[in-house]
Amino acid sequence: MSTYFPSSHDISRKWFVVDASGKTLGRLATEAARVLSGKNSPKYTPFMDMGDHVIVINAEKIRLTGLKSQQKVYRRYTGFPGGLREESFTRLLQRKPEKIVEEAIKGMLPKTKLGRKMASKLNVYKGDQHPHAAQQPQPLEINA
């Protein structure tokens, strides 16, 4: 008996929708990263993109535990001298709540070509509306 190696024809991708209302950021991110990488599938193969699509709605209603909501700082670098930009969690939550959830989930995926391919199947939206109703996404329950 030989080892099973799936081909690209064997992959059937599903769509899942996650409601972030009242969910803890890290717990939601780990579950979403697991589905995006395909580790929830019995046919998981590490060298192939086996993951499903994930839609996260209500990104503005995500929560953090402890004092992280006051202490957490998001940094980015422009590439110029003195170009380190810092923004607090509360400010970024008001301005771009989708960015918070995206960064948390992408940080849990591999930093390779395959990881970027997995991250492209992530869709995060502010509010409870999303344009993917035609794909008939199934709800993904996260106990957070």
From Swiss-Prot:
Pfam families: Ribosomal_L13. Keywords: Ribonucleoprotein, Ribosomal protein. GO terms for molecular function: mRNA binding; structural constituent of ribosome. It comes from the Bacteria. PROSITE patterns: RIBOSOMAL_L13. The keyword Metal-binding does not apply. GO terms for cellular component: cytosolic large ribosomal subunit. This protein is one of the early assembly proteins of the 50S ribosomal subunit, although it is not seen to bind rRNA by itself. It is important during the early stages of 50S assembly. Belongs to the universal ribosomal protein uL13 family. Part of the 50S ribosomal subunit. This is Large ribosomal subunit protein uL13. It comes from Acidobacterium capsulatum (strain ATCC 51196 / DSM 11244 / BCRC 80197 / JCM 7670 / NBRC 15755 / NCIMB 13165 / 161).
